[in-house]
């Protein structure tokens, strides 16, 4: 198990079981383990997801956005649910954004 810390400094777990689930369904992510963790810790922006989830998002190349869905259960615990690539900037309600992201808009 690996842990990343969200922008609210909450530890977010990525278990090996979850990682295997992610790469089983999204094999294009197989070499992006550390990028998934880094996206939770250093997202360009975070969107509100469904059922209390959050979507940490980072642009990692031309027309390539990494999205990590996670849930903060408490101030001391959270976990990654899944992750995937999108060909364009995700749409949704932004609840956090870096200054650099806002400048580039």
Placement of each model-derived feature along the sequence:
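Ribonuclease/tRNase effector modules and their secretory precursors
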Residues: 1-105
């Amino acid at each position: 198990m690996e842990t990343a810390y969200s922008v609210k400094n909450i530890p977010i777990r990525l278990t090996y079981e979850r990682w295997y689930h992610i790469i089983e369904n999204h094999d294009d992510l197989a070499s992006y383990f550390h990028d998934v963790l880094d996206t939770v810790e250093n997202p360009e922006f975070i969107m509100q997801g469904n059922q209390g989830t959050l979507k940490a998002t980072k642009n990692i190349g031309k027309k390539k956005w990494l999205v990590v869905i996670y849930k903060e259960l408490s101030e001391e615990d959270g976990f990654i649910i899944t992750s995937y690539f999108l060909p364009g900037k995700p749409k949704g309600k932004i609840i956090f954004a870096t200054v650099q992201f806002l400048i580039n808009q």
